[in-house]
């Protein structure tokens, strides 16, 4: 084989090897450096006005509360990257309906303090949610949860159903369509248990220059990723330790259906309270088929589909979502 042809055959793989040896570590270092420079805000001192921290098992979580503390409580729990500040409009409507509205930041998101142990399993998160509810001295609550935020909510509901009056789940990401496993880590989970992999990845994902693009990826109505919504999602990303905490949580979002309480399909029919499902018609993250499946598992449930909306109906179709939420609350 001529030497020139041999060189041309070798040049591409050599470039890839050089990129992997030099490019990837350099990119990781730049991402971590950028995160360290960006994440300078102290959580408690920079928390929103009128918010407060309460004990939540092994950490403290931020709570925003509206309305009379004598009124029945509606608790809002966000999904991936979300926090209590997303719910302000819907909290006001909730108060107008005669409830008190309570939005809780569950770690690692928002202003909640990162968990010292790094354990973000949904069962543990469910216990943290229950502990926060106890700290607030709330009983018989309605919980509104979005996306992956529904996983700890379901764990809490199965652990202490007597504390729950009703659930309102918005495009919940529960992973119930997958086969049941022994609960051991998948290959991808195992990979992301290594901090030297997960830390650079989350440092990139939490870069505020990518917030708008990432938000558009999970919604269908791309124009609804407005500057106002983007700023809301960006706000907690400047807090100390954010990307590190999310890197410890990341493997949990990749978990398969195992033997947690909320993984048991037959258990859903035993829930002694109504579950109201709100779903984006065009959701590609948790498709509508999952909503129909979940409705079949539940003994007392309803499913309302938000036209045109994807995985974030509360930001894609805010007026319609507000009316659907108000109707769900008024029916309780």
Where are these regions (language model features)?
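Active-site loop/oxyanion-hole signature of alpha/beta-hydrolase fold enzymes
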Residues: 54-57, 64, 103-144, 148, ...
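Conserved alpha/beta-hydrolase catalytic His-Asp/Glu region
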Residues: 42-43, 180, 202-267
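Short beta-strand/loop motif that positions the catalytic acidic residue
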Residues: 271, 277-279
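Flexible "cap/lid" loop of the alpha/beta hydrolase fold
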Residues: 158, 167-199
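Catalytic active-site module of serine/aspartate enzymes centered on a nucleophile-bearing elbow/loop
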Residues: 300-332
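Acidic catalytic loop of the alpha/beta-hydrolase fold
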Residues: 282-286
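Alpha/beta-hydrolase fold catalytic core
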Residues: 2-74, 96-99, 139, 330-332
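Conserved HGGG/HGGXW glycine-rich cap/lid loop of the alpha/beta-hydrolase fold
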Residues: 66-111
